[in-house]
């Protein structure tokens, strides 16, 4: 095959922005092909289209001879393509070990146990990961994560390996080892094509064929030598800059003017044995350095080596665990606002306000830095002119190109004319022209205004522009000096070689070069049936989800303890029983008859007698404070009038009506007690009652009339509707947030396999929780039991299948865990509480309310739970409900499959 991939008139846009604009490209087979260019030019979008994880919008994409617009073709190609998405280890699972990660990927491709073990052994031996098979992926170094990601990609012998910026953020030594490993693997596995996106031009020098991209278009193709020759430049970086479209009069290149040293001047920044620990992790380990005023001081190191943490300590944003620092000879204290007036800080992420214009961002920061009002407008105009932002002063930041946003961020950082600028990787993802323009501005600030600049970077050519640099690794400064001094000190030809030499003395055996001698493509492969491959893929997600859940104490606690806590709090806290009513008496009669009346109230558990009151003013205060619910005043002469029998004696009773239901029930209790009191007196005196009819009330099913007996079965329904749905929706959305959803999109996994595989662990946990809740109902709340336990268990099984499926359906429309939890809780709780029979029977609801209730599974399970607990229902009584729960389970699964996207837009 001459071409591994072909793109014809391909365009791809995100809203109004073109990521790819009419791209036509033929990628040769059997070679290492590089896509070069800064962030945002369309490299990742192009690779996503080739890998099949993005949906083609316009044009044709053909990979390995198959049309990627055909879903069947994409599924078939899933076993021939390997895709490593952008972000170090982003497709790996941090809580799983090296072995478990690779076992998961092996299952995704339907490999049987013996084949998986053989391939894992072969790949880990070849990459040097064999000694670390049981180490969690989250605890691997950057270089080891690279190797593990590569092993995961190679476990099924792909014909096409797609790598999206695989070396971004790792140190130069790990970068070099990674590409040497790729070269050795390609020598063993002949015929494999590799397509790589990279922002490192020096890295691209080793590729066979390149496609240079800018602004969504391919601007040049050919070998590195061809591109350099055509541009008439010695390096790819310079050649790429030469190919970029330039505005008339635009300056190219950067010249570092010499700095005039000030003898005896107080250093701008001094760090003394700075240490920063986060729990047991040491991010910064005894870092010391001195930066004189006006110097450009560079921090060079990989992601996670402690650069950003050190910078935050020097701005006062983080308190050091040990050590201290000085700014211009003054001790820097945490929260020292005066010191911050001397600092301009530019973080890795743009800290601009998207809803404010360029001018408004500058005006806001001018106010935040307390620039006097009379000076503020003048200073904003000066900065707009200085950074060439006047023409776009009324534009919003999000609509600006990355290079201009970077310039605006620097303008914001310098609005208060600080003496120190701390810049944390400010040029990441910016094209070389904008990067050069940015550096010219930094050099001007340093040389013309004496501003001290402390900057971190990944780019070697940027580090060479610094007056001095420090090489940092694993929280420690390895060396400090000028670029030339460091190069000569290590006996190297370039600064990158000097950094690699410094790292080689520090790295452990885990980062040692790999040996691919045992690597072979001839692993015994047994062709598995289609059913076995499908089961293997489903079980891969079930096993992985179970392992991740068990190793996440927070999620595990929520899944197991959450239902118990909710049941106890709601079971004991939500009650419609009206008892322990406090009452007070003002007995002005003080006769046996009046005391007998008071005793009629105090002798039953529904009432608790408080201290007597003596006046209506005191009664008002008691009622206002809520100290009593009922008050009774017995007038003088009550007993005498009662014995005479000529007229009915009068008493006064006050009831707190602030809670109507409680007040009405109290009134009913009171009338009942007074009636009983009168009947007892009639029986004793021999006077017959005038009442001709006696009514006695009895309650079916809940004869004790305890609300807990009615509430607990309904609470089981509510809890099983809420917790399992939230757990299952988080499980899917976490894949989107962490980036591991790429494993689903770039492999042969079908949507139903993905969903059911992730759903199964939560079905098991939810069904286990059901039995725990039933136990609490029987033995803690002493709810009577009359029905069939197996029937209730069967209904509960279908119910939790439905509720976990409901959570997965919600996850298809959300992108973050916070939004998923919120949406699931709101959508589940409102109809469940109001329309599922929890408060009012579904049959008594208005037609629209009843329709809403019956549209959710809770309304079908609630009668089953209550009926089997209290009414003795059997299978014949609830068969329709169980059938409907099974239908809900199927409907939610089908809707989830339809809503889940196998490809990104």
Regions found by a protein language model. Give the residues of each.
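Helix-to-loop junction immediately C-terminal to a conserved catalytic motif
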Residues: 51, 315
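Conserved ABC transporter NBD signature motif
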Residues: 59-70, 76-79, 323-333, 338-339
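Conserved ABC ATPase "signature" region
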Residues: 103, 107, 114-132, 363, ...
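Catalytic Walker B motif of ABC-type/P-loop ATPase nucleotide-binding domains
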Residues: 161-164, 421-424
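Membrane-spanning alpha-helical segments of multipass transporters and channels
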Residues: 245, 569-571, 590, 611, ...
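Extracytoplasmic/periplasmic domains immediately adjacent to an N-terminal transmembrane anchor
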Residues: 528-709
């Amino acid at each position: 095959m001459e071409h591994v991939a072909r793109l014809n008139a391909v365009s791809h846009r995100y809203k109004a922005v073109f990521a790819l604009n009419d791209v036509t490209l033929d990628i040769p087979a059997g070679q290492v092909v590089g896509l070069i260019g800064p962030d945002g030019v369309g490299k990742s979008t192009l690779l996503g289209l080739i890998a099949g994880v993005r949906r083609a919008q316009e044009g044709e994409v053909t990979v390995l001879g198959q049309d990627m617009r055909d879903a069947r073709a994409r599924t078939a190609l899933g076993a021939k393509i390997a895709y490593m998405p952008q972000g170090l280890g982003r497709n790996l699972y941090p809580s799983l070990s090296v072995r478990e990660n690779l076992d998961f990927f092996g299952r995704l491709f339907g490999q049987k146990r013996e084949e998986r073990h053989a391939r894992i052994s072969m790949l880990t031996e070849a990459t040097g990961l064999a000694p670390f098979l049981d180490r969690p992926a989250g605890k691997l170094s950057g270089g080891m994560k690279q190797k593990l990601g590569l092993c995961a990609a190679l476990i099924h012998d792909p014909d096409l390996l797609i790598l999206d910026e695989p070396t971004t953020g790792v140190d130069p030594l790990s970068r070099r080892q990674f590409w040497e490993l790729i070269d050795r693997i390609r020598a063993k596995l002949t015929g494999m094509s590799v397509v790589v996106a990279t922002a490192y031009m020096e890295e691209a020098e080793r590729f066979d064929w390149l496609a240079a991209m800018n602004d969504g278009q391919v601007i040049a193709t050919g070998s590195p030598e061809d591109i350099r020759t055509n541009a008439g430049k010695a390096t790819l970086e310079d050649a790429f800059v030469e190919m970029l479209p330039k505005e008339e009069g635009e300056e190219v290149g950067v010249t570092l003017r010499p700095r005039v040293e000030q003898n005896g001047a107080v250093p701008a920044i001094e760090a003394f044995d700075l240490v920063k620990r986060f729990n047991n992790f040491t991010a910064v380990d005894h870092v010391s350095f001195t930066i004189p005023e006006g110097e450009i001081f560079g921090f060079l190191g990989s992601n996670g080596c402690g650069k950003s943490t050190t910078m935050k300590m020097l701005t006062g944003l983080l308190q050091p665990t040990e050590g201290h620092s000085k700014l211009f000879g003054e001790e820097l204290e945490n929260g020292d606002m005066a010191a911050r007036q001397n600092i301009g800080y530019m973080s890795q992420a743009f800290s601009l306000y998207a809803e404010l214009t360029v001018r408004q961002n500058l005006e806001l920061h001018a106010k935040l830095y307390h620039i006097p009002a009379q000076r503020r407008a003048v200073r904003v105009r000066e900065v707009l002119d200085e950074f060439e932002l006047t023409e776009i002063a009324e534009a919003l930041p999000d609509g600006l190109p990355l290079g201009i946003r970077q310039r605006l961020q620097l303008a914001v950082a310098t609005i208060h004319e600080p003496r120190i600028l701390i810049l944390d990787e400010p040029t990441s993802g910016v094209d070389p022209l904008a990067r050069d323009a940015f550096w010219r501005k930094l050099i001007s600030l340093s040389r013309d205004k004496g501003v001290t600049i402390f900057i971190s970077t990944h780019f070697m050519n940027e580090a060479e522009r610094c007056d001095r640099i420090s090489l940092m690794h694993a929280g420690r400064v390895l060396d400090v000096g000028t670029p030339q001094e460091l190069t000569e000190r290590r006996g190297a030809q370039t600064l990158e070689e000097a950094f690699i030499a410094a790292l080689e003395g520090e790295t452990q055996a885990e980062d040692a070069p790999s040996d691919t001698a045992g690597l072979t493509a001839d692993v015994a492969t047994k062709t598995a049936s289609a059913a076995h491959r499908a089961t293997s893929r489903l079980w891969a997600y079930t096993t992985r989800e179970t392992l991740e859940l068990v190793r996440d104490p927070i999620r595990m606690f929520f899944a197991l303890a959450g239902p118990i806590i909710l049941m106890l709090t709601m079971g004991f806290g939500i009650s419609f029983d009206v008892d322990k009513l406090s009452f007070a008496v003002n007995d002005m009669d003080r006769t046996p008859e009046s005391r007998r009346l008071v005793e009629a109230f105090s002798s039953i558990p529904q009432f608790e007698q408080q201290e007597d009151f003596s006046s209506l003013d005191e009664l008002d205060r008691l009622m206002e404070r809520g100290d009593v619910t009922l008050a009774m005043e017995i007038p003088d002469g009550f007993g005498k009038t009662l014995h005479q029998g000529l007229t009915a004696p009068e008493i006064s009773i006050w009831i707190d009506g602030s809670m109507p239901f409680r007040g009405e029930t109290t009134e009913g209790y009171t009338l009942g007690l007074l009636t009983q009191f009168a009947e007892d007196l009639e029986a004793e005196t021999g006077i017959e009652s005038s009442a001709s009819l006696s009514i006695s009330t009895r309650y079916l099913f809940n004869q004790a009339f305890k609300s807990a007996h009615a509430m607990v079965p309904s609470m089981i329904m509510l809890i099983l509707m809420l917790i399992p749905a939230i757990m299952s929706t988080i499980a899917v959305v976490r894949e989107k947030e962490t980036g591991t959803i790429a494993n689903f999109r770039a492999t042969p996994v079908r949507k139903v396999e993905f969903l059911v595989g992730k759903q199964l662990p939560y079905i098991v946990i939810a069904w286990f929780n059901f039995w725990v809740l039933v136990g609490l109902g029987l033995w803690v709340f002493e709810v009577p039991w009359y029905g069939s336990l197996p029937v209730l268990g069967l209904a509960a099984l279908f119910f939790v299948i439905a509720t976990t499926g409901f959570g997965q359906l919600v996850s298809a429309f959300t992108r973050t865990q916070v939004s998923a939890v919120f949406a699931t809780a709101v959508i589940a709780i409102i109809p469940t509480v109001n329309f599922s029979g929890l408060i009012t029977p579904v049959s008594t609801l208005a037609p629209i309310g009843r329709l809403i209730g019956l549209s959710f599974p809770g309304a079908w399970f609630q009668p089953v739970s209550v009926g089997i607990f209290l009414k003795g229902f059997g299978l014949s009584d609830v068969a329709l409900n169980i059938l409907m729960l099974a239908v809900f389970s199927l409907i939610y699964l089908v809707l989830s499959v339809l809503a889940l996207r196998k490809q990104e837009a």
